[in-house]
UniProtKB/Swiss-Prot annotation:
Belongs to the three-finger toxin family. Short-chain subfamily. Aminergic toxin sub-subfamily. It is found in: Secreted. One of its GO terms (molecular function) is toxin activity. Heterodimer of C8S2 chain 1 and chain 2 (AC P01411); disulfide-linked. GO terms for cellular component: extracellular region. Gene3D superfamilies: CD59 (2.10.60.10). Keywords: Disulfide bond, Secreted, Toxin. Pfam families: Toxin_cobra-type (PF21947). This protein shows a synergetic toxic effect in that it enhances the toxicity of other toxins. Expressed by the venom gland. Disulfide bonds join 3-24, 17-42, 46-57. InterPro entries: Snake_3FTx (IPR003571), Snake_toxin-like_sf (IPR045860), Snake_toxin_con_site (IPR018354), Toxin_cobra-type (IPR054131). This is Synergistic-type venom protein C8S2, chain 1. It comes from Dendroaspis angusticeps.
Length: 62
């Protein structure tokens, strides 16, 4: 499985997931008005969102 770890003007960066990590995730955490910290990567289980964030998981490549 290959997951996106970042997006920028230059394109996307990806990572090959380790054995046992069969899901990709994208997590947003609100830092301020219209300002979010976004993290992406591989995971074994979908992480939980905190009160200021949102998480989306999938089990497909990129």
């Amino acid at each position: 499985l290959t997951c996106v770890t970042g997006k920028s003007i230059g394109g996307i960066s990806t990572e090959e997931c380790a054995a046992g990590q069969k899901r990709c995730f994208k997590k947003w955490t609100k830092m301020g008005p219209k300002l979010y910290d976004v993290s992406r990567g591989c995971t074994a289980t979908c992480p939980k969102a905190d009160e200021y964030g949102c998480v989306k998981c999938c089990n497909i490549d990129k």
